[in-house]
Amino acid sequence: MAEPSSSAPVGRPRTNLWLESRYRKLRRGLPQTVFFCPRCKGDRRRARDCTECGGYGKLTKESVQELIARRLLPAMQAKGGRFHGAGREDIDVLMLGRGRPFVFEVVGARNPAVDLEALRAEIVARAEGAIELAPFVPVPRARVAYWKETHFDKIYRAEVALEGVPTEAALAAARAFAGNVVQRTPQRVAHRRADLDRERSLQVLGLRALPDGALEARLRCQHGTYVKEWISGDDGRTSPSLASLLGVPARCRLLDVEEILTDDAVAPADPVDAAARPVTEG
């Protein structure tokens, strides 16, 4: 594949630019942005003796941000970059469908006039199946605020492990659920989020049995819904939950974002065929 040109006069003035795209995340264990160590915060001096990250400064080798930046910034001879996503998925969650919108802010680019399509193709090729990208589109800075401040419903696919066998009546009630749920700040994020009750809307689009006795659930959720906690109930902090509707303990063993319902998006009509999905486990 031809390398995108990055040659530019050394004395050329630097400029900032904003590139909008969407990413599909096809490998689990990949965070959206740099996953700095919570103990040393990535500080080189503190990282030397850090037992949390072993001196690495980060808890993962790569992120969506880094996979893009490692090729984009050198090609544009930029001083740095910032990743602005329209929300984020958990590190163990895939981002499928048309992908998650984002704006990559390129800071101090000396060579902004690169072939964006060649650059995108090079980034995807070097990511080796971890991500896919929509074409880059130069946009005004205001698009950062738009994606940060505008909230959209999402379609999820979840695999749910059960401890027990729900009744047919309970399954019917769960399949028919569409309404509001109240979620107290989940235990897993309570150390960094205010302890509040949040009300969110959720609709079950489908619920079917899998061969191993688990369930596959397809959900439409309001922005900010803690889907894993809605499935388990989070020790009573989410009500109603799928576990309470089914009458048996439940936990989310796998979660994918199938679509973000931006104004021009259409929700998938049918469940995604897991066997046909290009997914790399990590």
Model regions: which residues?
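Non-catalytic RNA-recognition surface used by pseudouridine synthases
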Residues: M1-G282
